Amino acid sequence: MALPKRLSAEYTMFVILEYLFSNSGGISISKYHIMTKIPELKQQRQDRISAILNTLETKDLIISTVTPNATFYRISEKGKTMYLHWISEFLKFFRDIKN
C-alpha cells in the first residue's frame, strides 16, 4: 500500500520529531535536510512543512536557529519528553492488543 501524497499534520509532526530525536544527534538541521532526508516527507509541500515546523516551535517541541542562509532546527528537551511519551503510548497500545 502506497503512502498518500498528503499525510496528516499529526503524522508529519511525529515523523519530524522522531527524525530529530533519532538521527540528528543533537545537531540542528535545515528544513531542506528534513524535506529531503525523511522519506515520508519527500512528497510534502514546502509551505506545509514550514507551517508544521512553526507549530512545533510554538509548542516548544523544537528550537530554531536563524542564520542568513537558512533556519536550522533541533529537538528541545520538551520535544524529547513528548516524543518518548508518544512512543510509550504507541507501544502500550500494541502490547495490550497482543495480550
Model regions and ranges:
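Short amphipathic alpha-helical interaction segments
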Residues: K42-T58
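Short acidic, hydrophobic short linear motifs in intrinsically disordered regions
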Residues: G26-I38
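A short, conserved structural fragment
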Residues: E57-T67
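Short, cationic-aromatic polyanion-contact patches
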Residues: T67-S88
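Residue at a beta-strand N-cap/secondary-structure junction
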Residues: G26-S28, Q43, F72
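Short alpha-helical segments that sit at the start of domains
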Residues: M1-G25
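Amphipathic alpha-helical dimerization/coiled-coil segments
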Residues: H85-N99
